[in-house]
Amino acid sequence: MFAQRQMFFARLAANLRAPAVRQTVQRRFASTPANESGKNAFVREREAVKQHAAETTELWRKISLYGIPPALALAGYNAYTLYNEHWEHWSHLPPLEERTEYPYQNIRTRNYPWGDGDKTLFWNESVNYHNRDKVT
């Protein structure tokens, strides 16, 4: 136990001592050029990659800000026009004949707690069909 305490206090004393004085100026080796003209291939490649990344980022920023909103507006206008044409066409058609309702459709064991109790939460009168008088 005494040896463990001795090791602990030796480490503590080493940590509390003042740190070694370091040079404030970085040491330059004789082979390191001080000017920019002596860049090696790695540094030149890294700078080229950095420049390419900046240009590509700017390109996609411009596409996102100036290209996407008009494309979304055109697509939205097209969808709206097609939707209106579709329902305009359906309004001119004669009424549909009674649809066949199969035994596995619209099974109700009890009424829903909303509305008249027979329609689901997302019921759409112009699309969904339910014959209350069906015989199973």
From Swiss-Prot:
An annotated GO BP: mitochondrial electron transport, cytochrome c to oxygen
Pfam families: COX6A (PF02046)
Membrane topology recorded in Swiss-Prot or TrEMBL: Single-pass membrane protein
Protein origin, superkingdom: Eukaryota
Localization in the cell: Mitochondrion inner membrane
GO CC, one annotated term: mitochondrial inner membrane
Alphabetized GO MF terms: cytochrome-c oxidase activity; enzyme regulator activity
Classification via SUPFAM superfamilies: Mitochondrial cytochrome c oxidase subunit VIa
Key words, A-Z: Membrane, Mitochondrion, Mitochondrion inner membrane, Transit peptide, Transmembrane, Transmembrane helix
Mitochondrial intermembrane domain ranges by topology: 84-136
Pathway annotation: Energy metabolism; oxidative phosphorylation
Subcellular location, principal: mitochondrion
Transmembrane segments: 63-83
Ranges facing Mitochondrial matrix side: 30-62
Transit peptide: 1-29
InterPro entries for the chain: Cyt_c_oxidase_su6a, Cyt_c_oxidase_su6a_sf
Function: Component of the cytochrome c oxidase, the last enzyme in the mitochondrial electron transport chain which drives oxidative phosphorylation. The respiratory chain contains 3 multisubunit complexes succinate dehydrogenase (complex II, CII), ubiquinol-cytochrome c oxidoreductase (cytochrome b-c1 complex, complex III, CIII) and cytochrome c oxidase (complex IV, CIV), that cooperate to transfer electrons derived from NADH and succinate to molecular oxygen, creating an electrochemical gradient over the inner membrane that drives transmembrane transport and the ATP synthase.
Known partners and oligomeric status: Component of the cytochrome c oxidase (complex IV, CIV), a multisubunit enzyme composed of 11 subunits. The complex is composed of a catalytic core of 3 subunits Cox1, Cox2 and Cox3, encoded in the mitochondrial DNA, and 8 supernumerary subunits Cox4, Cox5a/Cox5, Cox6, Cox7, Cox8, Cox7a/Cox9, Cox6b/Cox12 and Cox6a/Cox13, which are encoded in the nuclear genome.
Similarity-based family: Belongs to the cytochrome c oxidase subunit 6A family.
Protein name: Cytochrome c oxidase subunit 13, mitochondrial
Species assigned in the record: Neurospora crassa (strain ATCC 24698 / 74-OR23-1A / CBS 708.71 / DSM 1257 / FGSC 987)
